[in-house]
Amino acid sequence: MISSFGIRAAIALPLGAAVLAVAIACQPLASSNSSASDKIAFDLSSLDENGLYGPPDGKRSLDYEFCIPVGDAYAQAVGAIDPSVQLYPQSRGRIGCGEGEVLAIGNTNQADHDTVLIELANLDYIERIQPVDWE
């Protein structure tokens, strides 16, 4: 014969484990934006609502570069996120795109520039987005 303690223990242990599992599963995950913003090698807060930076009488947009894998699917995906992007398959850029990669250059002077940059940085195949160093 099973005691009432045995029955309660038999029910409580699995129930407790289930409650613990649900509690852990409901914890917020680290924001994907935090890892995405780590890929962006400049301070987004330095840009105004129009994607410009600098003194009031000398505002300018910021050009940025990153590498994407060769292929139409990658180019189309990036272009759908950032219409300012131009691809330069013959250049490595300062960022140093490797074999099998294409240099992409975009510009912050566009609507929702910060959202665009975060969405680009959220793509697994984009490792870094940095300012273009025009000489």
Tell me the role of every PLM-derived stretch.
Residues 51-112:
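Mature extracytoplasmic domains of secretory-pathway proteins
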Residues 111-119:
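Low-complexity, intrinsically disordered Gly/Pro/Thr-rich segments
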Residues 29-73, 131-135:
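Autoinhibitory N-terminal propeptides
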Residues 2-15:
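Bacterial N-terminal signal peptides that target proteins for export
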Residues 119-130:
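Short acidic amphipathic segments
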